[in-house]
């Protein structure tokens, strides 16, 4: 019985005081989970970005996507700044279009341009990033650093995907949430 109580104390559900004994802290497990998640920033969860230069062909974007085993590739300009995103869906639409030869068409012709992108910063909460992914029905967000305040000039510093969030949930369920701080 004492070991069960010790687990509940370590989990924050119970507390123990000398001469008082064990007592309920008022925290439920869902509240504790939300508290844990709210303290995690995008920088703690992000993965390495995969990018192609804007002058590459759509075919080269496909090759990069397969070699890196990702579903989204960021498109960068000559200065290394984010220009757009090309997803599997974008490439599939281009592949079934009879007017496009993927080996010849530039990736900028099939990408989603910067003006339509949703981005996150490393300081954003993972909850806010997850909300953006859900609300916009996308698989991946670029993690960016703003080059000039008030402009849309971004350096890509990472990416955050549904897989990152799934890994976080599994780690939290297995009690490994401390790995993200």
Residue ranges with predicted function:
Residues 10, 66-67, 135:
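The C-terminal cap of the DNA-recognition helix in HTH/winged-HTH DNA-binding domains
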Residues 26-47, 87-126, 130-138, 157-181:
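Tandem CBS (Bateman) regulatory domains
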